[in-house]
Curated annotation (Swiss-Prot):
HAMAP family in UniProt: Pro_tRNA_synth_type1
PANTHER family on file: MITOCHONDRIAL RIBOSOME PROTEIN L39/PROLYL-TRNA LIGASE FAMILY MEMBER (PTHR42753), PROLINE--TRNA LIGASE (PTHR42753:SF2)
Keyword Aminoacyl-tRNA synthetase carried by entry: yes
Assembly, per entry: Homodimer.
GO cellular component: cytosol
Record keywords: Aminoacyl-tRNA synthetase, ATP-binding, Cytoplasm, Ligase, Nucleotide-binding, Protein biosynthesis
Superkingdom of source: Bacteria
Domain writeup: Consists of three domains: the N-terminal catalytic domain, the editing domain and the C-terminal anticodon-binding domain.
Protein name, per record: Proline--tRNA ligase
Keyword match RNA-binding: no
CDD domains found in the cross-reference section: ProRS-INS, ProRS_anticodon_short, ProRS_core_prok
UniProt organism field: Synechococcus sp. (strain RCC307)
């Protein structure tokens, strides 16, 4: 490929819309262009990267015995209604684009394909002799993200590989899950990525177990918590830990203290000299359910802890989903929904806040669902808001008159510095990560809902055991840039680089340089190398900057030494340069490329 035919349009300055390095570089390097919020065009360079990533994914999935297929993007609402996910994905903050056709039939534009594949399995899989089977596809998915950001990281349209396996038993599902785990590790390794496998929450997909694969990068949206010995790692949403022991509140007489302007834990600690673990903070939320219920929540946490909203959402679904329908979302309870004259600033609220404050809203239930984390409930004495402006209570306790009894629910989030459960002598360490893969053991969730059964060895009908396995192909490509870049531009790993080598002609006006460059270009093509020839009539400095920006792993510079058959070989990742006879450097380059393609 010649640059003159490539449609290479690079930018010198960072686009205003881009926040993280990989997004800036992909836009500047002419890999992608924004069409609308969360919607991007993949330009020729990017498409070459995506094809290479997809090829590696296909090779490993095929080697693992999976069968490629292609499922419809338009999905009937009826399937999602049978699984119980239609309302959750379309109402409120649901992420599914949905529409009605000419016959007023409801359809969804697939964000995922569990329902469709399970319906097909119900039709196609009749006997244990057909099991196990694993079907996968690489396809564009659609999600109506509330806040699209970071380019391809969180878009409304993206390329994904999703696979679905069906098994005769839980044990066989476990074996299939383990096989996919190993296939995923090979995929990410071959793509040149440093990935951490972590325990994860199953979220809206569901199931009994799941694991995420995280590319470690400072711009990652997820917080990974892990032990120093490497034996434990989890997404913060799923992580478990032992909380720090609280600093005891010395015996004191119950009293109210003036705390003007001290509406946060940090402000109270600084002004009063208290320790955060001596305080109980109150968080007011509203949980919205499928059947229309809007349930106010009063959550009490120890002052040094944070709420894990994923844990809270899971608990609400488990405890109340059957009676109230699926949980649609959890939002902060706004002051405008309360009886304003009875409610102080939220920083002064205590666990005994009266239900009477809810009289200001006709939409909300008339009483709080009161929940408290054990770290708060186990405090014999604590400091909390006095439910009036500029005041806190000292030496409050849960057994005193007027203190409502909340339900005891594990709601705290694991935090960096917490003690590890498996070894309290170790502390959890934090790093940022970008999720590029997620595997699930779904169990019987979808097969039972959609009637997907098979005849087992005893001739009896039994539900299929199911797993699902996703890789964000377009997200993986951007994550590679986030992990491999420098101040000059991208640094693509060889296996997924759009081109492996770029030949730069220092002066297109020099016939000897052009002749040698053309000769090397032909040799590399014959050797099966993905090579790009920069044949533009531009200054050498412009060509060098573009070559570094777009991140081609190797650069051959044909300059003044061409008269003697001399060229310069530059490795993008290290910046190391070598000059010598073109025959010697070409032989060295081909040998090195062969090793790099294999991840060596």
């Amino acid at each position: 490929m010649r640059v003159s035919a490539l449609l290479l349009v690079t930018l010198r300055d960072d686009p205003a819309e881009a926040e993280i390095p990989s997004h800036k570089l992909l836009l500047r390097g002419g890999y992608i262009r924004r069409v609308a919020s969360g919607i991007y065009a993949y330009l020729p360079l990017m498409w070459r990267v995506l094809r290479k990533v997809s090829a590696i994914v296909r090779q490993e999935m095929d080697a693992a015995g999976a069968l490629e297929t292609l499922l419809p993007q338009l999905q009937p609402a009826e399937l999602w209604q049978r699984s119980g996910r239609w309302s959750g994905y379309t109402a409120g903050e649901g992420i599914m684009f949905h529409l009605q056709d000419r016959q007023d039939r409801e359809l969804g534009l697939g964000p995922t394909h569990e329902e469709v594949i399970t319906a097909l399995a119900a039709d196609l899989l009749r006997s244990y002799r057909q099991l196990p089977v694993n079907l996968y596809q690489i396809q564009t998915k659609f999600r109506d993200e509330i806040r699209p950001r970071f380019g391809l990281m969180r878009g409304r349209e993206f390329i994904m590989k999703d696979a679905y396996s069906f098994h005769a038993s839980a044990e066989d599902l476990g074996r299939g899950y383990a096989a996919m785990d190993q296939a995923y590790r090979r995929i990410f390794s071959r793509c040149g990525l440093q990935v951490v496998a972590v325990q994860a929450d199953s979220g809206a997909i569901g199931g009994s177990a799941s694991q995420e694969f995280m590319v470690t990068a400072e711009a990652g949206e997820d917080l990974i918590l892990s032990s120093a010995d490497g034996s434990y790692a989890a997404n913060q949403e799923r992580a478990e830990s032992l909380p720090a022991e609280p600093v005891p509140l010395q015996s004191a007489t119950a009293a109210e203290l003036d705390t003007p302007g001290q509406t946060s834990i940090d402000a109270l600690v600084e002004a009063q000299g208290w320790h955060a673990s001596q305080l109980v903070k109150v968080i007011l939320l509203v949980a919205r359910f499928e059947q229309g219920r809007q349930q106010p929540l009063l959550v009490s946490l120890r002052g040094d802890q944070q709420l894990n909203e994923v844990t809270l959402a899971n608990w609400l679904n488990q405890q109340h989903g059957q009676a109230w329908g699926a949980l649609l979302g959890i939002e902060p309870l706004e002051a405008k929904h309360l009886a304003a004259e009875k409610v102080p600033a939220f920083g002064y609220l205590g666990p005994d806040l009266s239900d009477a404050v809810l009289q200001g809203s006709k939409k909300l239930e008339s009483s709080f669902l009161r929940l408290a984390d054990p770290t708060a409930l186990d405090l014999p004495l604590f400091i909390c808001g006095a439910n009036r402006f500029n005041a806190h209570r000292l030496a409050a306790n849960w057994s005193e008159p007027g203190m409502a009894s909340p339900q005891r629910v594990e709601l705290r989030a694991a935090l960096p510095g917490d003690r590890c459960c498996h070894d309290p002598s170790q502390q959890l360490q934090a790093r940022r990560g970008i999720e590029v893969g997620h595997i699930f053991q779904l169990g019987l969730k979808y097969s039972e809902a959609l009637g997907a059964t098979f005849a087992n060895e005893q001739g009896q009908d039994a539900p299929l055991w199911m797993g699902c396995y996703g890789i964000g192909v377009s997200r993986l490509a951007q994550a590679a840039v986030e992990q491999h870049h420098d101040s000059a531009g991208m640094v693509w790993p060889v296996p997924i680089a759009p081109f492996e080598v770029v030949i730069v002609i220092a002066s297109s006006k020099e016939a000897q340089q052009v002749e040698l460059a053309e000769d090397l270009y032909g040799q590399l093509q014959q050797a099966g190398v993905d090579v790009l020839l920069d044949d533009r009539n531009e200054r050498a400095g412009v060509k060098f900057k573009d070559a570094e920006l777009i991140g081609i792993p190797w650069r051959l510079v044909v300059g003044r030494g061409a008269v003697n058959g001399q060229v310069e070989l530059v490795e993008r990742c290290s910046g190391e340069k070598q000059e010598g006879p073109h025959q010697d450097l070409m032989a060295q380059l081909l040998q090195t490329l062969d090793q790099q393609r294999q991840g060596l």
